[in-house]
Amino acid sequence: MSEVQGTVEFSVELHKFYNVDLFQRGYYQIRVTLKVSSRIPHRLSASIVGQSESSSLHSACVHESAVHSRVFQILYRNEEVSINDAMLFRVHLLLDGERVEDALSEVEFQLKVDLHFTDSEQQLRDVTGTPMISSRTLGLHFHPRRGLHHQVPVMFDYFHLSVISVAIHAALVALQQPLISFTRPGRGSWLGKGGPDTGPEQPTISLENLVFGAGYCKPTSSEGSFYVPSENCIQHAHKWHRDLCLLLLHAYQGLRLYFLVIMRDIPELPTMELEALAVEETLSQLCSELQMLNNPEKIAEQISKDLAWLASHLMALWTQFLDTVTLHSQVTTYLTQEHHTLRVRRFSEAFFYMEHQKLAVLTFQENLIQTHSQLSLDIRNSEYLTSMPPLPAECLDIDGDWNTLPVIFEDRYVDCPVSGHNLSVYPNFDVPVTSPAIMNLKGKEKNLINQNSSSRKDIPLSTTEAPQLGSDEDVTRRPEVQENVSTWNPIDVCSESQVYLTIGEFQNRAGIPEDECWTGPRPDAVKDSLTDTDICSRSPGPDEGQTPALTYIDVQSSNKYCPRAELVQGINVQHEHRSSRESYGIVKTVPSKVVAGTSQNNSTSLNQTAALELRTLGRGVNQDGKPVLLSLKLTPAEPCDPPSTALREALDTKPSQPDHAEEPEDLSALSGVIKRSASIISDSGIESEPSSVAWSEARSRALELPSDRDVLHQVVRRHAHHRNSLEGGHTESNTSLPSGIQASLSSISSLPFEEEERELALNKLTKSVSAPQISSPEESAEGADTIKNTAGFSEDLDPSSKENSPPRHTSLSYGGSRVQDVRAGHSLADIALDSDRPQGPGYMDIPNDKGNHPELQEPCCLDGMAETPLHVETKGLNLKIPCTIVLENSKSRSFHRAAGETAKGKPEELSMSKCVLSNNSISEVRAASHHRVPEISCSPAVEAVNLNSTGVQNSSLSVNDTMTLNRRHNASLEAKHEAGTVCPTVTHTIASQVSRNQELKTGTSISGSHLNSTEAFTLDSLKAVEVVNLSVSCTATCLPFSSVPKETPARAGLSSKQNPAPITHQPLGSFGVVSTYSSKLEEEVSERMFSFYQAKEKFKKELKIEGFLYSDLSVLASDIPYFPPEEEEENLEDGIHLVVCVHGLDGNSADLRLVKTFIELGLPGGKLDFLMSEKNQTDTFADFDTMTDRLLDEIIQHIQLYNLSISRISFIGHSLGNIIIRSVLTRPRFRYYLNKLHTFLSLSGPHLGTLYNNSTLVSTGLWLMQKLKKSGSLLQLTFRDNADLRKCFLYQLSQKTGLQYFKNVVLVASPQDRYVPFHSARIEMCKTALKDRHTGPVYAEMINNLLGPLVEAKDCTLIRHNVFHALPNTANTLIGRAAHIAVLDSELFLEKFFLVAGLNYFK
């Protein structure tokens, strides 16, 4: 067996130490040790970076391969200490020479981080004498090609609450013959007691034997140079050489690409030139040189030289990288955000939520509880949970795994629930059997040599076979992510489902070979491709010829809750043509699904319009030469329409005679799924854009709280500049995908108080994975000038222009942001100039206008164009048809300039996936993938119809902005046709004839090509989102391919806190977003992530439960990492949020310490003040009245003592403490604060007492304790404080006001908790009470007394959580105590609960 020595280096940085809640003052020290699996022979060395010769007693040092940080002293609460120690661990590994890469990937690396403490200076002198008080072990998931680049805030245990920020960078730096001797792990004696170091040292292998394999015999000196090795030996040498060189080249490329990424994303880093080693070219050169050699010694020597040469380049780059990033604060911030986003996403798995009608809270939902129990068991044993990948650098104690993370079910009781769906958002969605590794998604590295914006590949997921790519193809994809997640406020506005009709269920992404693209003249592909059709036009004007044939597609859905709701009227496909128009084939791409939802609105602005007629769709020509106009009608429906069930109705064509109709054209074939998407009407009366197809209605709502709007206002203020930096100041809108709360900014974008920011903020917002996206000229002067000229250009647009003049295209401008609209009836070259398409490739969108509004920011004098309404609520009618996408020169959008240059015969570069990197600015050319689609069209050139729907309807919409470009567009397009820059394959879409639509149900899709002019626009901090969109069904937040966004870094002058979340560039097999920067290295998606995604989809299909997963939402509760670098100064003028924490029976003030900690960490700068109640900790066995008086006194004294200006008050209670809280609310002295109540978080509270406890053991124990302690509270909990049940304390308490004053009432319960009956903690009926004719009626009255006022309260939302902890088999678990206290001391439960959902209740 040949063996290879591989060298891996780990750079570990200790940044800051945070005293979260340490008990002891004194001297602390961090010690770091790298551990390698003992199964692999290895040698480890450690060193400290930048340490001088002289070192003091307290400075960092190395002791026995462990690095000791400098000693630091902790004296104060919340103290932060900068450690700033950097260390380097070098590991030499002996690897199997036949499978070096696999062997490297399998090595288990662990980083042990220990916290040592002493309060004695004397003890510090003894290195080994300082005791360790806490320890954490990080699993490092290193990949030889990508390395590892991650940052982890390591939190120590409950008794030593503190955090050390650790950054880790790792890379493969060398592969060579074994030059050092390795100690083999000993086999041990027959008793197995042998230690790891008992094995003999392995003798070194000669280079020739290593290179030529075991069958090689070194020739004797007599044979000399006449000896020729066998063919097998030569082949072995060449393969060995090729494999090692390839791995080193990939490692070099992976490190270089990551280096380029962070230089681009972090403006503060110095920009430098990095030497490029093209993988294929360099490898072929090295191999060809080797093949010219025959002498075995020279072959071996050359191989050794090549490996050393590559290793030297790799080491030089690695050194350069470390010099740049080590201890750099901005790099730390970047990695911190990345880790936090991934971690929150991972926690959101196995966290379900479901909505119910408010009245359902009073019903007995036994089936629901049983479903939860069964589902939790199914999940624990499902491949979905067991295949969940780890984080790139993980600590099981604080990150958990499938075996330790809790499963949580949330039930929300709201006025207008979203239900009627099972977890399978797209039930017909097929997860492909082809894994990404099989799909050859490799590309050439050269695309990043000249381009900063890295390529990204989209994995094709379709109902048919996934198209494959050529081995050398790049698929650079426009980012398509839905960040427009509408918040849904059940109080202010009923959940308004939005109609979006999506023709095209998936995004089928693949590429075409580059040789199929051409830049020379191809008149045959171009000559018939231009039609003089309106790109975005309403019904034709009187001066136009009209063919009244109309195809009417009626999409209907059923609604079991609100039958009055009117649904989508249909898609009118009108055929019209002008008198002199030739008949050309129009591309009507009609894939297999129509995803639609009905839309209701109870606001006055919607009712202003009796019907919505969206005819701003593209007109083209069908097979019979009749131009086709797609239009949508929507009549407003009744408010409060709960979602309809998923319907699969074919979009059958029916005759209809609106406007200009004669004969109906047949356009049947669409199997539809009608889905709902909730949205909210903002304060300004403008509705947020619905989630795109990639989002379920559940995903389209981030926060379902009455205070959502307040929360969002707060968030928007906090992230005002953040959004401005989403694009780093360039004019591309969809190149970034925000994470966390930022992902909901689309829905926030219409809030009135941010009008002044809209011009800068809105144009940065990305729309959705496949939905309308917004692009704007932003601050660029050229773009502004272009907009100013809009009126003039629109005048040139004559509806009866010449036959061969290119069609117009239009864009809607929202306060400076532009949505380029439909393009129909023209070839790819026609669209090439208008290539700044925010729209993701493969879809055609229908604008979602709600009616006309007199106010337009820019004049709407477009011929044949209808005015785009302003200040009108938009329902998301997105008709998505796969289409071509191209890039516009977005810096200036100067079509005349491009036209002039092209007319001079300057062909544009047809960029399939190439990016350009300049020293100080980054230009990005996004090339859409090209799909191989069946050429079933009869016309010579099939054009792509691209209907881009409008984005968020903001205060000012101007159709006119992009129309200004039309006249210039015409000239430039003609010039482009002369230049012949057309990719013919792209011009084929899946259908050219309406009559053939039935064949399209398989869902083939067209792709677009991005044509990039030679003068690529350069913009600072331009970049692409690398989110691998598996399909429409794969939400932007799907774990594997999450839209855990990749956003731009803060621009110069903006604080690093506003730095958006980066996408991860992590090794295969670890959890997270798949980075495209490494997409040129190998198959982009790891097998593990891919199988996890498949398992998740399978799980959602198999389990038919009406509910949703939080992981399918784009916005979760936490988007800001712990300890942000720049916390905003608290402005206490608005008052503070007082949070009162009340412990339970026999508890103390420290019981809710972790709860307080995670809220504080999750909401930095949240103006929170915690009162940890301690007045009752000495006697929790007293009666409730006594304890109520104590707590009330404590609260009022706290407010008066600190002279607090209270804006809101929230309560968190555990167990019996919840009863005390409810009792306080009834006291007259507290009446003044009732209007300030915000959230009541009840953790296992016995609100209905301890009646009907199913644990005899616990009931007996409580009875015994009550007797021994003579406890009044326990007596009252068991309803034995009065013979008349209706005079018992708990019954009388239920009759008093209380819960309805809160905005959020959150009840957390667990069936594993036997201390408090499950139904009592949830305040609901139980089966035993129903059968009990004596106590049961009283029990039911209590429930009605408690929940009745809550149901009637408009501003109150009830949320119940059902938690299934992963508990060990212990006595505590058996008696139910473990689950009872897990809500207090389980870091995994608390972090999962708060980071995913719970923090919303305290914002």
Curated annotation (Swiss-Prot):
Keywords: Phosphoprotein. This is Protein FAM135B. Residues 649-661 have a biased composition (Basic and acidic residues). SUPFAM superfamilies: alpha/beta-Hydrolases. Belongs to the FAM135 family. The modification Phosphoserine is found at S775, S776. Residues 731-740, 802-814 have a biased composition (Polar residues). Residues 445-483, 514-548, 648-669, 718-740, 790-819 are annotated as: Disordered. Pfam families: DUF3657, DUF676. InterPro entries: AB_hydrolase_fold, DUF3657, DUF676_lipase-like, Lipase-like.
